[in-house]
Amino acid sequence: MTPADPVETATLAASVTPPLTKRGEAKAARRREMLDAAARQMAARGFAGVRLEDIGGAVGVSGPAMYRHFASKTDLLDQMLLDISRRLRDGGAEVVDRGLPPAETLEALIHFHIDVLVTKPDLIVVQDRDLHNLTPEANHEVRSLQRRYVEQWVDVLLALMTERGATLAQPEARVRVHAMFGLLNSSPRLPALDSARLRTVLTAMATAALECAAG
């Protein structure tokens, strides 16, 4: 039996995130509750129309207690939009890393984004509308995360067009991806539609926007 490499063992041990304690789990769950409540209220009333006290009241937390979790309303917004931006970037990377053919990868990216959109519409609304209310540092990081997410799509779209023998310049691929996000991300502000039908419609729209034949 080959003895374990101590360096490799130490590296693996360091890479494993220790499990949360029950107290840590409860704190993380409460934080998610607060962020979800904040997203709902900010999507409905705008960043300026919501106070930390309003958010706390929605989850049974007093105004002063909110400051144990967030330094300010802007700090809460920073964390909210950093969270969703990382989720999109990481989810897109996971799809790309599956190593599927370009057409299947693009389809999986579309389904992934629509799933986030349908299950977390308030976050998408706030992300789309309130970037200017972030601190400069958070704004810079969110935009960097968004650019990396966009480039994941651009790379897959270019690979698909190449596979099909079509010519598509990178700037146009980027325009198509941004336009597609504009279509999808506006849907939470449109009249309500059955979830299954909404997914079908958005998938068709996204595919058409990305693969359109522009002469």
Task: List each language-model region with its residue ranges.
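Helical hydrophobic small-molecule/effector-binding pocket
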Residues: 107-128, 177
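Amphipathic alpha-helical packing segments from all-alpha helical-bundle domains
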Residues: 86-89, 137-163, 174-178, 200
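Amphipathic alpha-helical linker/stalk segments
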Residues: 80-107
